[in-house]
Amino acid sequence: MSLLTEVETYVLSIIPSGPLKAEIAQRLEDVFAGKNTDLEVLMEWLKTRPILSPLTKGVLGFVFTLTVPSERGLQRRRFVQNALNGNGDPNNMDKAVKLYRKLKREITFYGAKEVALSYSTGALASCMGLIYDRMGTVTTEVAFGLVCATCEQIADSQHRSHRQMVATTNPLIRHENRMVMASTTAKAMEQMAGSSEQAAEAMEVASQARQMVQAMRTIGTHPSSSAGLKDDLLENLQAYQKRMGVQMQRFK
């Protein structure tokens, strides 16, 4: 796996699924392929994206700045600086300075990532902030190691939170999660339908599922009534894909 592929993998792991994630993936691919060369436009686009947390925007802004060539005097962006200040905690800043000194001695991506993983997310963000504000310089490879360590820590905490929700025994949360997943699956079916001959059928199934979820939410139903809803939808989707000659086992 190439270095840039690895960076793209880690960065995308902290972005919530949805159309925006697909859009960001495309921007990252373009940036890494040298196709998107206007850093100002790219940063303005990033600043106005909805849903993303300030820290996620900070990480993406840092990656774009590292990768896209820019004029030396180009102004640093406030939204990135604010996201990478370690919540203004002096303790984070102290640790960031110590980490920076260690990173200066590293020359490889993996070495930098290994060193960075022993620090907290706040300290890692502060260290990125130091480098972003030109208070310190490291090689691009080492900076990418720092980025990936930060993403790994964020993804770990997101995974723990997700696992807690999936494992919850609260029937109301499980019920709502099944309905949200059914709606998301229906939306994916509509997007995949495109203009094929079978599109009408897929759209019909998706539309019925959306209406069912809407009705269940409006009138209120027993928490067990949504069981199997997403699975039924996925079966319909896979049957549709087979007829289309498409195999997408990974969809689940």
Curated annotation (Swiss-Prot):
Subcellular location: Virion membrane; Host nucleus
GO biological process: viral budding from plasma membrane
Pfam families (UniProt xref): Flu_M1, Flu_M1_C
InterPro entries: Flu_matrix_M1, Flu_matrix_M1_C, Flu_matrix_M1_N, Flu_matrix_M1_N_sub1, Flu_matrix_M1_N_sub2, INFV_M1
UniProt entry keywords in alphabetical sequence: Host nucleus, Membrane, RNA-binding, Viral matrix protein, Virion
Gene3D superfamilies listed in its UniProt record: 1.10.10.180, 1.20.91.10
GO (cellular component) term, any one: virion membrane
Transmembrane helix keyword on record: no
Entry membrane topology: Peripheral membrane protein
Start and end residues of each stretch annotated as RNP-binding: 165-252
Motif mapping: Nuclear localization signal: 101-105
Keyword Nucleotide-binding among UniProt keywords: no
GO molecular function annotations of the record: RNA binding; structural constituent of virion
SMART domains, sorted: Flu_M1_C
Region spans: Membrane-binding: 1-164
Top-level lineage group: Viruses
Subunit composition and interactions: Homodimer and homomultimer. Interacts with NEP. Binds ribonucleocapsid by both interacting with genomic RNA and NP protein. May interact with HA and NA. Cannot bind NP without genomic RNA.
Similarity remark: Belongs to the influenza viruses Matrix protein M1 family.
Any further remark recorded for this protein: Most abundant protein in virion. When expressed alone can form virus-like particles in transfected cells.
Function: Plays critical roles in virus replication, from virus entry and uncoating to assembly and budding of the virus particle. M1 binding to ribonucleocapsids (RNPs) in nucleus seems to inhibit viral transcription. Interaction of viral NEP with M1-RNP is thought to promote nuclear export of the complex, which is targeted to the virion assembly site at the apical plasma membrane in polarized epithelial cells. Interactions with NA and HA may bring M1, a non-raft-associated protein, into lipid rafts. Forms a continuous shell on the inner side of the lipid bilayer in virion, where it binds the RNP. Determines the virion's shape: spherical or filamentous. Clinical isolates of influenza are characterized by the presence of significant proportion of filamentous virions, whereas after multiple passage on eggs or cell culture, virions have only spherical morphology. Filamentous virions are thought to be important to infect neighboring cells, and spherical virions more suited to spread through aerosol between hosts organisms.
Name recorded for this polypeptide: Matrix protein 1
Provenance organism: Influenza A virus (strain A/Fowl plague virus/Rostock/8/1934 H7N1)
Gene name linked to the record: M
